[in-house]
């Protein structure tokens, strides 16, 4: 991306978290190097970004989920971690450690199937997932945070999108040490 000398339209697809928190940094570096090059940033979930890159509708993608395809050059880019969280008023907010029994009792507000965040959550909850109560799936991180703030249930999102909410005390971070919520972010 940054080593290109040609100045032409660059069409980038990014997942929601990446677009909101990381893409602009990379885009600004490209704009410094290729002054005057027009850029389009479109937001999709991981599956959609992969499909659009494969169909040549996008020049590159920035994704949160795993992708495997022989026609794609998939480059690990950054590390990320999901955080479980709840309203400060939720009974789990006062618990130092969350165990599987707590995870099964909770009502969950999650990203939709096909998103990288949901992919990581589903992997982390292996063995529990069929028994979990997921009454609400939403496409946007802000909508999930607002629903959790209203104490409708608990959520799971990237630490990148929760940092400020934790700092203001609007959401409480939950610790479930037996669940691996780490993930890689990729360029394709």
Where in this protein do the model-derived segments appear?
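Short loop/turn segments at beta->alpha junctions
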Residues: 45, 99, 139-140, 158
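Short beta-strand->loop
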Residues: 12-16, 107-113, 175
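Thr-Gly-centered strand-to-loop micro-motif
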Residues: 63, 87, 111-112, 134, ...
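Beta-alpha-beta core module
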Residues: 69-76, 80, 95-96, 142-188
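Secondary-structure junction motif
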Residues: 92-93, 100, 106-128, 159
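Short, well-ordered beta-strand segments
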Residues: 9-13, 61, 85, 109, ...
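Flexible hinge/capping segments at coil-to-helix
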Residues: 3-4, 69-109
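Central regulatory/effector-binding core of bacterial HTH transcription factors
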Residues: 7-70, 129, 138
